[in-house]
From Swiss-Prot:
Family indicated by similarity: Belongs to the UPF0353 family.
Segments forming a coiled coil: none
Main location: membrane
Protein name (record): UPF0353 protein NFA_34780
Signal peptide positions on this chain: none
UniProt xrefs under PANTHER family: LEUCINE ZIPPER PROTEIN 4, SPORE GERMINATION PROTEIN
Keyword terms: Cell membrane, Membrane, Transmembrane, Transmembrane helix
Pfam families: BatA, VWA_2
Alphabetized NCBIfam families for the sequence: PRK13685.1 (NF010238)
Residues in VWFA domain copies: 90-295
């Protein structure tokens, strides 16, 4: 029963009263003992009284004092930090669908593993969250607008089609637009629901050029825009340094060449930093699933202060009742 705060702290002052009662009981017991020794016929007393009084004679008052302590804590209105499912939030999963996702360094392929882990992420999110799905290669597409229909999102993940080039910035900008559209449709609330973008990619941006950081469509520019809107972008760098794919030659002769497609941790780390999100890496299904599990905890739940007085109230009542019962069972009187 953890406590993080009290709503009526003044009631804890009653603990001083409990302490005075305990002190008074001790003083009364000592006074009675002295009076008994002073005025009693010791020969008679030794014959009729037990040689050593049972310590159980103090149990009733001890239990009732402890019960009063618990009841006092309950009266002070204790609260605790509680984790509760979010019932108002928007998340957009943004997935890289460039040709590099065909790489088999994460067996059976980056794409298949990303699809499997992505669908598990969808299933794991709490039902109150509106979840959307965006893909990007040379351009970005809204595969599923934010919705609470999890089956629709999983169907969209199953329908991924790979394409050339990588426009990471377009993916972020499209996700932002999707979030804003939902907020407009919902309306009514004084503040828009909290939102988060989860971006999974395996390579460096190629459209626009990765070095053209001032381009309004650049991923870094999009990340700064997300930051200004209060929408963090959590990024996942997925794959290994030794990934490669077969790329058809452009000469039309039917040939191909193997091209290395290593992951680009630095760019994705910078996107997360600029937007206020968090950066993760994954090079296997297990690692990607673990990342999504972490994000589910962060996104799907929020911490709030909740009333924690009931356990203390019940415990206090039980202990006081135990004190009364003990007093009835073990009360001793001299004959």
């Amino acid at each position: 029963m953890s406590i993080s705060h009290f709503t009526a702290l003044i009631w804890l002052g009653f603990l001083a009263v409990v302490a005075l009662i305990a002190l008074g009981y001790v003083l009364v017991q000592r006074s009675r003992h002295r009076q008994m020794l002073r005025f009693s016929n010791m020969e008679v007393l030794e014959k009729v009284a037990p040689s050593r009084p049972s310590p159980l004679r103090h149990a009733p008052i001890a239990l009732m004092l402890v019960g009063l302590v618990f009841l006092t804590i309950a009266a002070a209105g204790p609260t605790s930090v509680q984790k509760v499912p979010r019932n108002r939030a928007t998340v957009v999963l943004v997935m890289d669908v460039s040709l590099s996702m065909e790489a088999t360094d994460v067996p059976p392929s980056r794409l298949e593993v990303a699809q499997q882990a992505g669908k598990e992420f969808v299933d794991g999110l709490t039902q109150g969250i509106n979840l959307g799905f965006v893909t990007f290669a040379g351009t970005a597409s809204v595969m599923q607008s934010p919705t609470t229909n999890r089956e629709a999102v999983k169907a969209a993940i199953d329908n991924i089609k790979l394409a050339e080039r990588t426009a990471t910035g377009e993916g972020i900008l499209t996700a932002l637009q999707s979030i804003e559209t939902l907020a407009t449709v919902l309306g009514g609330a004084e503040t828009p629901p909290p939102a988060r973008i989860v971006l999974m990619s395996d390579g460096k941006q190629t459209v626009p050029d990765d070095k053209d950081v001032d381009n309004p469509r650049h991923a870094f520019t999009a990340a700064r825009l997300a930051k200004s809107k209060g929408i963090p972008v959590s990024t996942i760098s997925f794959g290994t340094e030794w990934g490669s794919v077969e790329i058809p030659d452009q000469d039309g002769q039917g040939g191909s060449q193997r091209v290395k497609v290593p992951v680009d941790n630095e760019s994705l780390r910078e996107i997360a930093k600029l937007s206020g999100g968090e950066f993760y890496t994954a090079s296997s299904l297990e690692e990607l699933t673990a990342v999504y599990d972490t994000l589910e905890e962060q996104i799907g739940y929020e911490t709030t202060r909740g009333d924690a007085s009931r356990p203390w109230l019940l415990l206090g009542m039980l202990v006081v009742a135990a004190g009364i019962v003990t007093g009835l069972l073990y009360r001793q009187r001299l004959p």
